[in-house]
């Protein structure tokens, strides 16, 4: 049974939109987490404990930033590839019609 691979630029752009929504969600949650950590930080923590807590939170914040960057990279790649596919499809149609 032969399988046909079909490229759907509109579906690729729709999926890119989903990746953007996921990136925004991760970014919003990371921002809330950071604000919460800042509020907790001053509540009875001091010295090394506070510094360690803030360092851990900074590392987590960077990890979330990396996730957001990767999601944006996937989004951008899907949009770019959808555009390239459409351009190549148009060029092929022009060649075939001439």
Swiss-Prot record:
InterPro entries per record: ESAT-6-like_sf (IPR036689), T7SS_ESAT-6-like (IPR010310)
Record has Transferase as a keyword: no
One of the record's GO cellular component terms: extracellular region
UniProt keyword terms in alphabetical order: Secreted
Subcellular location: Secreted
Pfam families: WXG100
Classification via SUPFAM superfamilies: EsxAB dimer-like (SSF140453)
Domain of life: Bacteria
Family under the similarity heading: Belongs to the WXG100 family. CFP-10 subfamily.
Quaternary structure note: Forms a complex with EsxO.
Name of the featured protein: ESAT-6-like protein EsxP
Species name: Mycobacterium tuberculosis (strain ATCC 25618 / H37Rv)
Gene: esxP
